Amino acid sequence: MVNHKLLKLDPGLYLVATPLGSARDITLRALDILASADVLAAEDTRTARKLIEIHGVPLNGRRIIAYHDHSKASDRSRLLAHINNGLSVAYVSEAGTPLIADPGYQLVRDARESNLTVLAAPGPSACITALTVAGLPTNQFHFVGFLPPQQTARQKKLAELLPLNATLVLYESPKRLKALLSDIETIVENNRQVAVCRELTKKFEEVKVGTPSELLEHFELKAAKGEIVVLIEPGGSTEIDQSDLEAALLEAMDTLRIKDAADAVAGAFSMPRREIYQLALRLKKDSLTP
């Protein structure tokens, strides 16, 4: 069965998300673009070729051009020249969504500066997948990617990030995971919840949630392997003054509809939207009561 169809793509740069591990996680639109683009570029040409072969997408004489973090400005210029000449260019990173802790930023920046069309075929992302399954707050999150490998620099960066009232999303290698957990344990109170999400969407997927010390104990007994996403529970004070909350909500309701005011205040205070909406309705009712 052929899952792709050939399209007439307009000239432009098409950023195509690819599976993290399970080849079946690719979207039909991604297959259409990979089958139809005039030019194919990839962070890892071997991985891209394997994915294309799995899904029966014919190359039809097209070669896959390598583009990665070590590519030169001249490599970007050649890719963008294809677009200027009326061709479509599809780009994939090794896995997941291009630019999200993956190459592609400078390519997109140069394309935008040249007023070229840039489009995305969205799909898998390790960051979003980890947030989905870990059970930590998702109303506000801060994507960090990889921290510095050196301990001093890593601890300094963590000290800046850990007070944020947002779930932190980090990528880490298996060999540095225990060092990272140890640093977190050193800097924050040990009741802070951390999730280690390993090999997401793959056969040996594992999600462990606990305090830094609990996770250190777990990974002392069982060495971590594969691709790892680490999520850290939000910092900041969890004590919210009710009068401050109501004052902010009343102020927002002066200029916004109740639903929009509730959404804005819920985001600002990192609280459930439904709870804030119910409070807004009560405040509105009280204001109408003589």
How should each PLM-predicted stretch be described?
Residues 12-16, 86-93, 141, 166-170, ...:
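Generic beta-sheet signal
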Residues 3, 106-164:
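Class I SAM-dependent methyltransferase SAM-binding "motif I" and its flanking Rossmann-like core
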Residues 99-114, 181, 185:
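Short Gly/Thr/Asp-enriched flexible loops that form oxyanion-binding sites at enzyme active sites
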Residues 2, 10, 88, 167, ...:
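A contiguous loop/helix-start segment that scaffolds small-molecule binding in enzyme catalytic cores
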Residues 34-40, 115-119, 167-168:
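Short active-site oxyanion
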Residues 66-73, 147-150:
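Conserved helicase motor
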Residues 42, 120-123, 170, 196:
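General beta-strand structural signal in soluble alpha/beta enzymes
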Residues 1-67:
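Glycine-rich, flexible N-terminal cofactor/catalytic loop recognition
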